[in-house]
Curated annotation (Swiss-Prot):
Parts of the chain that traverse the membrane: 32-52, 53-73, 93-113, 116-136, 152-172, 180-200, 226-246, 248-268, 289-309
High-level lineage: Bacteria, Pseudomonadati, Pseudomonadota, Alphaproteobacteria, Hyphomicrobiales
Chief localization: membrane
Gene name linked to the record: ctaB
InterPro entries: Protohaem_IX_farnesylTrfase, UbiA_prenyltransferase, UbiA_prenylTrfase_CS, UbiA_sf
GO cellular component terms, semicolon-separated: plasma membrane
A Pfam family recorded for this sequence: UbiA
EC number: 2.5.1.141
Pathway, per record: Porphyrin-containing compound metabolism; heme O biosynthesis; heme O from protoheme: step 1/1
Protein name as annotated: Protoheme IX farnesyltransferase
Length: 316
C-alpha cells in the first residue's frame, strides 16, 4: 500500500471509534507538550514583573492545550506516513484506535478553546502568538514544509520556539529582545536535535518520501550543518548573560553546556558515512534534550536566585 492509498483508506474511516482517554492523551504528543510547558513556564518566570498565580496557571494550561491541539492536528494529517514509519506506526490513528475525523475535531476544538481562554483570561497578544504557533505547526510545517523541502525542520522549528515568548507575553503583554533571545535558543537548537534523529532514521523518512536533509543532501552535508547549528545555539544560549537578564554565573554554565553540545556534534561530524549503528548521532539526540532542559533550568534558577538576593537585601 502506498502513502496515498493509505491516506485514502484512513480518510474513509468515518465511524466513531472506541478510543480510550489514553488514546486521546497520546494524540496530544505528551512528550513534546512537556517541553512546551517547561519552556513556556520559563518565559513566565524570566519575564520582568509579576502575574497573578491563578492567571499564570491558566496561561500554562492554555499553552499546554494549544500545544496538544497542534500535535493532534499533526497526527491527523500525517496519519498516512505515520502508518509506514516504525517510530510512529503505533500512534492512535494509524493503529486504528481513533478515526481521523475524530482527531481533526479534537484538535480544532482544543485549538479554539486554548486561544479563546488565554485571550479572555490573560491578554490577547499572548493568545495571538499561541494561535499563530498552532497555525504555523499544523499548516505551514505539517501540511507544506515537512513534505516539500529539506529545510522543513529549520523553518518549521519556529513553532517549537514560540512557547517561552508566549509565557513572557503573558506577563508583560509585549515582545522584547529578551523573549526573542529565548525564542532563538530553541529555534537554533532544533536543527541539530532533529537532524541527529534523521540520521539514524533515514530509512523511515526515505520510505515515506519526507525530504529530510540526510536523504536529500547526504550524511556529510547534514553533519556539517549539525555542527554549525550547535555552535550557533551555544553562542545564543550565552546571550542572556551578555544582555543582562541573567548573571555571569549563568553564562559560565551555559558556556560549559554549549561546549559539550558542540563536542557531541563534532563526534557526529567525525562519524564515518554509512555507519549503521549511528551511536554518536543517538548520543547527540539524547544530550540535546538534556541540554535544552538544562539551559532553561539554569535560567530559571538564576532568576529565582536574583529575586531572593534582592528580597534579602530589601529586608535588611
Amino acid at each position: 500500500m502506498t502513502v496515498i492509498d493509505n491516506h485514502e483508506a484512513l480518510a474513509k474511516d468515518g465511524e466513531l471509534s472506541e478510543a480510550s482517554a489514553r488514546d486521546y492523551f497520546e494524540l496530544l504528543k505528551p512528550r513534546v507538550m512537556s517541553l512546551v510547558v517547561f519552556t513556556a513556564f520559563a518565559g513566565l518566570v524570566l519575564a520582568p514583573g509579576q502575574i497573578n498565580p491563578v492567571l499564570g496557571l491558566i496561561a500554562i494550561l492554555c499553552i499546554a492545550v494549544g500545544a496538544g491541539a497542534s500535535g493532534a492536528l499533526n497526527m491527523w494529517y500525517d496519519a498516512d506516513i505515520d502508518a509506514i514509519m516504525s517510530r510512529t506506526a503505533k500512534r492512535p490513528i494509524p493503529a486504528g484506535r481513533i478515526a481521523p475525523s475524530e482527531a481533526l475535531a479534537f484538535g480544532l476544538v482544543l485549538s479554539c478553546f486554548s486561544v479563546a481562554i488565554l485571550g479572555l483570561a490573560v491578554n490577547w497578544l499572548s493568545a495571538g502568538i499561541l494561535a499563530f504557533t498552532i497555525f504555523f505547526y499544523a499548516v505551514i510545517y505539517t501540511m507544506w514544509l515537512k513534505r516539500s523541502t529539506p529545510q522543513n525542520i529549520v523553518i518549521g522549528g519556529a513553532a517549537g520556539a514560540f512557547p517561552p515568548m508566549i509565557g513572557w507575553a503573558c506577563v508583560t503583554n509585549s515582545v522584547t529582545i529578551e523573549s526573542t533571545v529565548l525564542f532563538l535558543i530553541i529555534f537554533l537548537w532544533t536543527p541539530a536535535h532533529f537532524w541527529a534523529l534523521a540520521l539514524f532514521k533515514m530509512r523511515d523518512y526515505e520510505a515515506v518520501g519526507v525530504p529530510m536533509l540526510p536523504n536529500v543532501s547526504g550524511e556529510r552535508v547534514t553533519k556539517h550543518q549539525i555542527v554549525a547549528y550547535a555552535v550557533l545555539t551555544a553562542i545564543c544560549a550565552v546571550l542572556p548573560s551578555y544582555l543582562g537578564f541573567a548573571s555571569f554565573a549563568y553564562g559560565l554554565v551555559a558556556a560549559a553546556l554549549g561546549a559539550i553540545f558542540i563536542y557531541c556534534s563534532i563526534a557526529v561530524w567525525r562519524m564515518p558515512d554509512g555507519d549503521l549503528k549511528m551511536i554518536p548521532a543517538k548520543k547527540l539526540f539524547a544530550f540535546s534534550i538534556f541540554y535544552l532542559f538544562a539551559i532553561f533550568s539554569a535560567l530559571m534558577i538564576d532568576r529565582l536566585a536574583a529575586m531572593l538576593v534582592s528580597y534579602a537585601g530589601g529586608s535588611l
